[in-house]
């Protein structure tokens, strides 16, 4: 009796587990897992970047995104001014390169007379190159009594024995100005706020100048205990200072260059089919920050000029060279190539404008559990996860329609619309996350989304075409 009851229960349990519904559920689980596995392997290939595809697409994504959002970047242009020692300055005042120390001191004294907030000199002075070096060092020291004077430094060159030798030029300059590093290892389109060198941490130019700026302003960046070791993604604006037309000979080129999102995006779409000359015309020709020629400060009226006073007072001044053939250049996605001093100035403007909300480039994951060195950040992992989900869903739907060996067995229009809406939500999530982390890899994400949509829309079009042909054939048969 008990044996028969046990057999009956066993048959019921077995029938329940091998029912058609359970089999269908197992098949769906298998195909879902198989689809996600395929998507996961593809995302891992992108994430681990064996061919450099991730870095290339990330870099291009940033260039496009920084350009199309340039109009919406509310940059505090009134916080900085750039002074360029250009060819006009050298030729009009019969100078030579490098400019002699007496002329540099004259420029510095004139700027100091207008009470700037701070001064940065983007000139690496490793050895004395003309007479008057001691006079220049003394001028730096006197001007530094009124406001901080930061001088460019190469940490690899400034060995301890140079800085400790009283007869060495670098020692004399270190006693007269604040040496600040201007070169670092790493990605050239990133601006670190701090540098670790030989076990010591140094602030870069933008961070040092901003710290001085915050002494008279309410800044949140220095109120936290964060190490600020995540480099900045420098944002660029496509507007120019209202007072730019009063200085430099740029009146023919400084016209309104504010582009809408669509216009900026269209520029990158057609850039592949245009020449370098045509691309140059699309770039913003005006400097991103109010820019003066150093010749203004070598004129006889340089010490009592109200126009100069209005644009120098309480601003951070960045001094640098602008010469043809210079290798100290930075590439702006909005302006093209600019002199290196603009990189420091624009990074400072980013800090003034965004404070602690500046766009960060997240560091690679430390103590990576899956590899010796993880060349990706947590934000990269988030992007890879979202890419896996989008691609996995599309592969699952594609596998679902092919199980019966028929491409006409396409997903319904409702399923397709839901998938598209899901993709839009994913993109919105990435857009929200990147407000604090910087531009996402939109090229990779968009490419995967388009591939996923194309896999689904092809069978839908085939089914729609077959239905139309069937109706047409049916209509003809009735007429016959």
Question: Where are the language model's segments positioned?
Answer:
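Flexible inter-domain connectors and hinge/loop segments
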Residues: 2-384, 462-480
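Short hydrophobic alpha-helical membrane-anchoring segments
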Residues: 40-51, 396, 400, 428, ...
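Selective detector of the "anchor" transmembrane alpha-helix that sits immediately C-terminal
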Residues: 366-403, 445-455
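Juxtamembrane interface at the cytosolic side of transmembrane helices
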Residues: 390-436, 460-472
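Loop-to-transmembrane alpha-helix initiation sites
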Residues: 435-448
């Amino acid at each position: 009796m008990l044996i028969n009851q046990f057999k009956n229960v066993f048959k019921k349990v077995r029938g329940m587990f091998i029912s058609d519904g359970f089999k269908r559920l197992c098949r769906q689980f298998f195909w879902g897992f198989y689809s996600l596995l395929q998507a996961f392997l593809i995302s891992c290939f992108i994430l681990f970047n064996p061919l450099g595809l991730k870095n290339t697409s990330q870099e291009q994504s940033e260039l496009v995104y920084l350009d199309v959002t340039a109009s919406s970047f509310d940059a505090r242009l009134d916080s900085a001014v750039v002074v360029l020692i250009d060819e006009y300055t050298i030729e009009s005042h019969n100078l030579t390169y490098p400019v002699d120390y007496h002329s540099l001191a004259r420029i510095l004294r004139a700027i100091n007379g207008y009470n700037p907030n701070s001064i940065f000199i983007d000139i690496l002075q490793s050895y004395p190159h003309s007479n008057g070096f001691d006079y220049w060092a003394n001028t730096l020291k006197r001007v530094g009594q009124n406001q901080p004077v930061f001088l460019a430094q190469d940490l690899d060159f400034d060995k301890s024995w140079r800085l400790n030798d009283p007869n060495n030029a670098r020692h004399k300059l270190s006693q007269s100005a604040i040496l600040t590093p201007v070169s670092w290892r790493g990605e050239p389109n990133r601006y670190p706020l701090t540098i670790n060198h030989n076990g010591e941490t140094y602030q870069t130019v933008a961070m040092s100048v901003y710290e001085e700026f915050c002494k008279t302003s309410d800044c949140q960046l220095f109120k936290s205990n964060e190490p600020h070791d995540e480099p900045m993604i420098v944002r660029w604006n496509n507007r120019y200072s209202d007072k730019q037309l009063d200085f430099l000979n740029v009146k023919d080129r400084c016209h309104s260059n504010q582009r809408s999102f669509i216009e900026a995006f269209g520029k990158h779409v057609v850039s592949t089919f245009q020449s370098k000359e045509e691309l140059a015309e699309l770039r913003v020709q005006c400097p991103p920050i109010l820019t003066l020629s150093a010749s203004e400060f070598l004129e006889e009226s340089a010490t009592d000029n109200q126009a100069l006073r209005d644009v120098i007072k309480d601003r951070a001044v960045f001094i640098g060279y602008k010469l043809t053939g210079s290798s100290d250049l930075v590439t702006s996605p909005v302006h093209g190539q600019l002199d290196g001093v603009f990189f420091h100035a624009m990074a400072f403007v980013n800090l003034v404008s965004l404070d602690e909300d500046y766009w960060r480039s997240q560091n690679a994951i430390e103590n990576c559990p899956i590899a010796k060195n993880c060349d990706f950040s947590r934000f990269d992992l988030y992007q890879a996860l979202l890419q896996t989900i989008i691609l996995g869903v599309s592969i699952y739907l594609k596998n679902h329609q092919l199980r019966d060996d028929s491409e006409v067995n396409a997903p319904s229009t409702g399923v397709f619309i839901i998938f598209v809406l899901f993709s839009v939500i994913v993109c919105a999530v990435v857009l929200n996350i990147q407000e604090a982390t910087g531009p996402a890899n939109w090229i990779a994400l968009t490419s995967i989304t388009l591939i996923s949509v194309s896999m689904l829309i092809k069978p839908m079009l085939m089914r729609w075409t077959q239905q139309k042909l069937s109706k047409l054939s049916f209509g003809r048969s009735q007429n016959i």
